[in-house]
Amino acid sequence: MQVAAIFIDAEIEDQAQELRKFFKKLGAEISEDKSSKGIEDDLHKIIGVCDVCFKDPSLHTVEEIDAVLNSVVSIIVSIPLERGENLILAFCEKMTKAPDQKLAQVCLQSLWRLFSNLELTSPLRYHVYYHLVQVAKQVDQVKEVFTGVEQLKNQFTQCPPSNEQMQKLYRLLHDVLKDTNSELASKVMIELLGTYTAENASYAREDAMKCIVTALADPNTFLLDPLLSLKPVRFLEGELIHDLLSVFVSEKLPAYLQFYQNHKEFVNSQGLNHEQNIKKMRLLSFMQLAESNPEMTFAQLQDELQIGENDVEPFIIEVLKTKLVRARMDQKARKVHISSTMHRTFGRPQWQQLRDLLHAWKANLTLVQENMKSVAEAQIELTRKQ
């Protein structure tokens, strides 16, 4: 996200007095006179009434309000860090109170200016960013301030937030992303669970359940096996949500249908869509079949996936679109030929398979190298004889 840089051609004391006059004219309970206690007290009182400009937007243009808030931010960043914490927190809180989207957009820009102009080593950047995400949600611009977990971590490399602060931020990000970007929301929840240790994993029950539900509901998340290794998820072993996750990790469609038949109310109570679950389980079942069957007939797929004869080809096309499986469809022979597939689980057998494959490649490369060496030696010998 980019906004204009802060540049106010006036002394901060003069700016503060102009702001006092401006807010006074709007009806705010504030004196026009400078505070005898200094600029920090001026700023404290200005921030306390700055939201008065939100009450009747018709009195001023959005651009004018933006300029006023820009002036407030320019004073805030001039205050020494050790004395500015309460001022920054108060300003951030005011910026979340915009009554409509146009003003919320102005507040978003003001918070971004503040965030961008704080020292990279300032611990207050975390608090500004947290409120920034809240306001971005209001104007549907979360993607402008958050693009991924790595980008987030990079922003705080010089002053990392505490573990508890990151957990709070991850929960907020999940909440604002879950309805618009389920894939990214799922990644955020997995990152959140990764912040728990063996000592406190038992307290992450709610987060773990949200993480599982988000991953199951996301139509683009198919590799679910890593969730089972997360400590908070392990504490759910024996509970229905963990049993359901295990079905999605390694079982086929019939196992899910049986689970749903036995626990229909539970599945629905988690906000999961049964039809979407079936669709996902069919795809996961196909992947599992593809691991051990380089060739499958349409009839076999009909039986295994419980789909109609006319639905087989459209289903295969949908599978190929995910790029999880590479295959060729033979419509005449009514077969599908598998080239490769992503494994649903990656445990010891898969590591062994990968080891064997790499050893085979190594042996083949060694053979090629020896053959090339023999050809080169023969060529040299032939040249000598000539």
From Swiss-Prot:
Cytoplasm as UniProt keyword: yes
PCI domain sequence ranges: 181-343
Tree of life domain: Eukaryota
Subcellular localization: Cytoplasm
GO cellular component: eukaryotic 43S preinitiation complex; eukaryotic 48S preinitiation complex; eukaryotic translation initiation factor 3 complex, eIF3m
Keyword entries, A-Z: Cytoplasm, Initiation factor, Protein biosynthesis
UniProt cross-references to SUPFAM superfamilies, sorted A to Z: ARM repeat (SSF48371)
Gene Ontology BP term (one): formation of cytoplasmic translation initiation complex
Any one Pfam family match given in the protein's UniProt record, by short name: PCI
Molecular functions (GO terms): translation initiation factor activity
Keyword Acetylation attached: no
Function according to Swiss-Prot or TrEMBL: Component of the eukaryotic translation initiation factor 3 (eIF-3) complex, which is involved in protein synthesis of a specialized repertoire of mRNAs and, together with other initiation factors, stimulates binding of mRNA and methionyl-tRNAi to the 40S ribosome. The eIF-3 complex specifically targets and initiates translation of a subset of mRNAs involved in cell proliferation.
Family that this chain belongs to: Belongs to the eIF-3 subunit M family.
Assembly: Component of the eukaryotic translation initiation factor 3 (eIF-3) complex.
Protein name: Eukaryotic translation initiation factor 3 subunit M
